[in-house]
Curated annotation (Swiss-Prot):
A Pfam family reported for this protein in Swiss-Prot or TrEMBL: Sushi
Spans traversing the lipid bilayer: none
Descriptive protein name: Complement C1s-1 subcomponent
Species for this entry: Mus musculus
Entry PTM: Cleaved and activated by C1R to generate Complement C1s subcomponent heavy and light chains.
Tissue occurrence: Predominantly expressed in liver.
Domain CUB: start-end pairs: 16-130, 175-290
A GO-annotated cellular component: extracellular region
The keyword Repeat is annotated on this UniProt entry: yes
Gene Ontology MF term list: calcium ion binding; serine-type endopeptidase activity
Modified residues ((3R)-3-hydroxyasparagine): 149
Domain Peptidase S1: start-end pairs: 438-680
Job of this protein: Component of the complement C1 complex, a multiprotein complex that initiates the classical pathway of the complement system, a cascade of proteins that leads to phagocytosis and breakdown of pathogens and signaling that strengthens the adaptive immune system. C1S is activated following association of the C1 complex with immunoglobulins (IgG or IgM) complexed with antigens to form antigen-antibody complexes on the surface of pathogens. C1S is cleaved and activated by C1R to generate C1s subcomponent heavy and light chains.
Active site residues of this protein: 475, 529, 631
Length: 688
């Protein structure tokens, strides 16, 4: 292996005699290397002279061509030396310099020194044996660019950056493969504004980042392409093709298409096709990248922020639903969402819509119902009703609910709180037809006294005052905290009680001023004989079960002698035995003095020891009275000043000296504050 470092390269070229040839400087048409000496020995057949001519000379200029040069030597004599940048003396001829020699041998020597400050491409020369000139002696030019004559023929050649097609006559240009990625630029046909090459296909690509569309702008005067033929076909044409559409082909003098082409694509292909003829200057265009725009799509029932006339790539908007509408994604809902203008001109989240808020199925309520709506969306109105006549709406305007913007059912008065159906008090299903009193009274239906509570142990009565509370006498519960109670039954026969509604006590509250005694049989003080039983579960009201009203605190609820009230129960009769079926009677109020005058039946108690207070009511008449087993039952009076008769509990059966005469009743009006306070302080969460 030879390893040489050469600062000067000497090369020579010689061959058998030929009729023609080509001589090119090293690396032509690229820049020639430094420090080179290369020679060519030209020889044509005997009898021919040599015609040597240069078509390209671009050699470092110097005085007398002392640095770089190409020498023409004939017979040892220098016939010429060339350097510098030379051009053709005639625009119609590619020949820059030419030499003719009568002899058939010639030497060409190219020399370059050790350095060049600029880029020089060297030279291109051709030689022929002198004979006829096919390139000039005929009318038709055989070559599209350069014609080179030789004895017996010719050959065609092309200028730099061109190539010779397979037909060996026409030159084309290598103008494909350029890719433009800058957001702004300019593209023109080859040689513009000089004539473009014939028989060529130039392909260019504009590729911008996603989110930008290619916008092409043309000036009519910057377009000069061979016009269409009589049938409208373009022999030479310029065509644009984006992803989804094509623009063109275009040809003619002056651009015939729109001067601004918006492609709606970030890529654009440009094809310039020419045929074998033509001498037009071509075209020049400018392009830039314009952010892709997204159309403002009006989403129903929403607002856009910011609100602009035009939205472009990467713009973000907040879409907020108007009141009563929401966006639902899976199981998550919200009142707004964000959308971004994407690179394809479409909005992200375009599938989201503002739809009416869904409130769901209205919650049920105890002792009432709600109409089933056709739908449960914003603006829908539903109505709650109670199971009349046994329940009524606690708030008169509390039945109408509207599906609100927050997705909740809302009432103008109660807000989101559900309406409450409370028992209607004091209205018996069947009014009691009075004939006589309990003691020797008359049979009654439970529908006459639906508030009647039967205490089986101890045997007594009570009054249902709402769904969770029973009012009775304190002495009934003095020795027991878990009474056995029933409602809704006329008969207290053991077998029939199984079908009655049993009440379970949660807690017993005896009035704090009630005085306990060890022996109830000797009690003489029944002051504050009142108690409350709180129930574990609410009582279901109906035709046989409903509460009695509490008295008001006004003077209208004061009872006076002569006023008639109703009593009921399962106490003993004139025969001294407990009854099985409910009995009722109507009794008048008398003065307390009347009760004081009753003869005592119990010999162990002195009559003067009995205590009479303003907390007591005396009522009854001979043969008409409550008795043992009726204790705690209601002494009912009609509520004053009402259109539909209803009853309130004015008194509770408390005590008496002798059955069948006059009895003493606890005056409930004096205890209303205690009753309400006790119920309020001990009411837990409602089971609505």
């Amino acid at each position: 292996m030879w390893c040489l470092v050469l600062f000067s390269l000497l090369a020579s070229f010689s061959a058998e005699p030929t009729m023609h040839g080509e001589i090119l400087s090293p690396n032509y048409p690229q820049a020639y290397p430094n420090d080179v000496v290369k020679s060519w020995d030209i020889e044509v057949p005997e009898g021919f002279g040599i015609h040597l001519y240069f078509t390209h000379v671009d050699i470092e200029p110097s005085e007398s061509c002392a640095y770089d040069s190409v020498q023409i030597i004939s017979g040892g004599i220098e016939e010429g030396r060339l350097c510098g940048q030379k051009t053709s003396k005639s625009p119609n001829s590619p020949i820059i310099e030419e030499f003719q020699f009568p002899y058939n041998k010639l030497q060409v020597v190219f020399t370059s020194d050790f350095s060049n400050e600029e880029r020089f491409t060297g030279f291109a020369a051709y030689y022929t044996a002198i004979d006829i000139n096919e390139c000039t002696d005929f009318t038709d030019v055989p070559c599209s660019h350069f014609c080179n004559n030789f004895i017996g023929g010719y050959f065609c050649s092309c200028p730099p950056e061109y190539f010779l097609h397979d037909d060996m006559r026409n030159c084309g240009v290598n103008c494909s493969g350029d890719v433009f990625t800058a957001l702004i630029g300019e593209i023109s046909s080859p040689n513009y504004p000089n004539p473009y090459p014939e028989n060529s296909r130039c392909e260019y690509q504009i590729q911008l980042q996603e989110g930008f569309q290619v916008v092409v702008t043309m000036q009519r005067e910057d377009f000069d392409v061979e016009p269409a033929d009589s049938e409208g076909n373009c022999p030479d044409s310029l065509t644009f093709a984006s992803k989804n559409q094509q623009f063109g082909p275009y040809c003619g003098n002056g651009f015939p298409g729109p001067l601004t082409i918006r492609t709606q694509s970030n890529t654009l292909g440009i094809v310039f096709q020419t045929d074998l003829m033509g001498q037009k200057k071509g075209w020049k265009l400018r392009y830039h990248g314009d952010p892709i725009s997204c159309a403002k799509k009006i989403t129903a029932n929403s607002t856009w922020e910011p609100d602009k006339a035009k939205y472009v790539f990467k713009d973000v908007v907040k879409i907020t639903c108007v009141d009563g509408f929401e966006v639902v994604e899976g199981h998550v809902s919200s009142t707004s969402y964000y959308s971004t203008c994407q690179s394809d001109g479409q909005w992200s989240n375009s599938g989201l819509k503002c739809q009416p808020v869904y409130c769901g199925i209205p919650d049920p309520i105890a002792n009432g119902k709600v109409e089933e709506p056709e739908n449960s969306v914003f603006g829908t109105v539903v109505h709650y009703t109670c199971e009349e006549p046994y329940y009524y709406m606690e708030h008169e305007e509390g039945g109408e609910y509207r599906c609100a913007a927050n997705g909740r059912w809302v009432n103008d008065q109660l807000g989101i709180e559900l309406p409450r159906c409370i028992p209607a008090c004091g209205v018996p299903t069947e009014p009691f037809q009075v004939h006589q009193r309990i003691f020797g009274g008359q049979p009654a239906k439970i529908e006459n006294f639906p508030w009647q509570v039967f205490f089986n142990h101890p045997r007594a009565s009570g009054a249902l005052i709402n769904e969770y509370w029973v009012l009775t006498a304190a002495h009934v519960l003095e020795k027991i905290s878990d009474p056995l109670m029933y409602v809704g039954t006329m008969s207290v026969r053991t077998t029939l009680l199984e079908n009655a509604q049993r009440l379970y006590s949660k807690r017993v509250f005896i009035h704090p001023s009630w005085k306990k005694e060890d022996d109830p049989n000797t009690r003489t003080n029944f002051d504050n004989d009142i108690a409350l039983v709180q129930l574990k579960d609410p009582v279901k009201m109906g035709p046989k079960v409903s509460p009695i009203c509490l008295p008001g605190t006004s003077s209208e609820y004061n009872v006076s002698p002569g006023d008639m009230g109703l009593i009921s129960g399962w106490g003993s009769t004139e025969k001294k035995v407990f009854v099985i079926n409910l009995r009722g009677a109507k009794v008048p109020v008398t003065s307390l003095e009347t009760c004081k005058q009753v003869k005592e039946e119990n010999p162990t108690v002195r009559p003067e020891d009995y205590v009479f207070t303003d907390n007591m009511i005396c009522a009854g008449e001979k043969g008409v009275d409550s008795c043992h087993g009726d204790s705690g039952g209601a002494f009912a009076f009609q509520v004053p000043n009402v259109t539909v008769p209803k009853f309130y509990v004015a008194g509770l059966v408390s005590w008496g000296k002798r059955c069948g005469t006059y009895g003493v009743y606890t005056k409930v009006k004096n205890y209303v504050d205690w009753i309400l306070k006790t119920m309020q302080e001990n009411s837990g969460p409602r089971k609505d």
